[in-house]
């Protein structure tokens, strides 16, 4: 009787452990992501790799073959549909994402579009303990030896506001001199360049924002006239607004 009970208990424990998603220090972890994904998805993956290294002191590898983590956008990566996961929460949604543990223990990060996929990747960074304010607030993440999500874990989220972001105001006394005199001193005064904007856009991406209204005071050179700004906005999937001075 006792042997039978222990056998059943052991079977249940093994089944539970098998269905978990688990990573730990020293483990080879691979992300399966198609090269045809949009730039914002690959940008988010680069941030995740950096975050993973900061938390586990290990590398996260990105490949197009089978991995511990499957990343993909609906109608871009066929592996998402082939995973047999319930994708109903993404259909017809804008910038939505799904994180779910598959029966074989892999983690699926899927998006209804490229922004949704990128936000799902950043959600994993948040779950392992990385703050969106990591750089701006010197919020260094705590080291961990392992991280796991239970069997059947499912996390579906979508924004309720279509365009979400910030505008830069009164840059004369803060952002502009800091950027052009200290953070990017190779630019002439009056320019807020791509290095500064990359830090701003990283924060926006981590916070799931998608829109930015640049500084427009007379002391500042226009956003699109500063070389590199357009490219960094595309890299982070940021829409640039022009209604600031209304």
Please report, for each region that a protein language model flagged, where it lies by residue.
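Short secondary-structure capping/junction motifs at helix and strand boundaries
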Residues: 2-4, 131-136, 210-212
